[in-house]
Amino acid sequence: GEPALFGAALLAGHCAGDLQEGPRHAALDARWRRQALAHVGPADWQRGLEECPRLAEGWSQAMAIWQAGQRSDTCDAWAPRFKAALTALGFPGERALDSVAYQVMGALGDLLAEFTALAPAAGRLDGRAAVRLL
């Protein structure tokens, strides 16, 4: 993936360890920038997670959820997997929800409900296609 995208996600927080490991998340982003990585591969990501145990645990759980289901499924099956994977990652973060975050969570719930309703029309999708459609 793109280092800038990974870095932005790490700096935004909203994940497991965002309060306690926030400085480590920022240091990882800074290291990738200093190294001028063109791509963060799975090995780079796994090495980075070694410094962030709470995020590493969440990542491991999210990947297990993602991989536990069928490779091709309908929107109504993908939606709970998306939600469970995000929850495993610690979304929406460790901070108390403010008004804006509460509204974002409501909008995400609405989006997942709309996505679920697409099941009859969309048919079976692999994970990438499901994410794109979402």
Q: Locations of the language-model features?
A:
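Polyanion-engaging groove/track-forming segments
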Residues: 1-134
